């Protein structure tokens, strides 16, 4: 398990390798396609990326600088061409793909976005379903002993503590995963708030990055938030047991995240895959599971270096996944990844 200190080190500008990606420094590349790489994006990926950077450098002597600035920032920087690759838990929208027609999406990690809470006297594993979670973030449910929560937790001693919803104030793949899920289970959420890396939350308190959200959650009795799986694990947060479409209340782990990914029978041509709220036939699937995508230009002058790092990430780099609550990529996704990597520099 990684420490909170090591997680916090990946967020601020300049704290991963040189940090140029987080600061918007231009990446000019080299004609040979070798040399260092810069990337930026997903904070959910950051703990795994930190392991990749160290191991890849020791194996190859090449450095990878990564700015954990959020998926929205990663999309912006790869579109602007200021980094060699981006990383996002949200796939491109059609408009974003149109703005970056030469950038391909490669699902290179599999994890989850986890609803977590800090309520005095309430232990880990509180039951919640999607519509109730939506109503909390809509501001319709405001106390922890609300009948809707009590009904899902018979016999639990729920306090009248005020609920403080905490959300990401930056462009976030975790926000995308949450809102993608809520839009599938709550018609009111879909029509009034919608899906995106940045949405207008009707109520609550914002925090920048997974670390900012974690800080607000830790100091606020009655808070509910959503963070990447590695952050929930390393901080020891109490995690919701979310009801899936089969009616089972599950927490995220390698089995339940993997079960959600197993519902992917075929990979679309652009590799964009949503596995939130999987069908009831996936009885053990966690409903807020997600892929994280590498965003890579096929016409990069660093094609050789990019392909080397991507091959590492979906190959030897997978050895670090389990300890950080990242599940194994399904074989059909790995096959699509390899085919897409072969398009780079082609």
Task: Identify the meaning behind each predicted range.
Residues 1-11:
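Bacterial N-terminal signal peptides that target proteins for export
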Residues 18-22:
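C-terminal motif of bacterial Sec signal peptides marking the signal peptidase cleavage site
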Residues 24-26:
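Bacterial signal peptide processing site
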Residues 29-150, 158, 210, 214-218, ...:
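N-terminal segment of the mature folded domain
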Residues 38-42, 136, 144-145, 160-171, ...:
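Short beta-strand->loop
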Residues 171-263:
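Ligand-binding pocket segment of bilobal, Venus flytrap-like solute-binding proteins
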Residues 245-305:
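C-terminal lobe and pocket-closing loops
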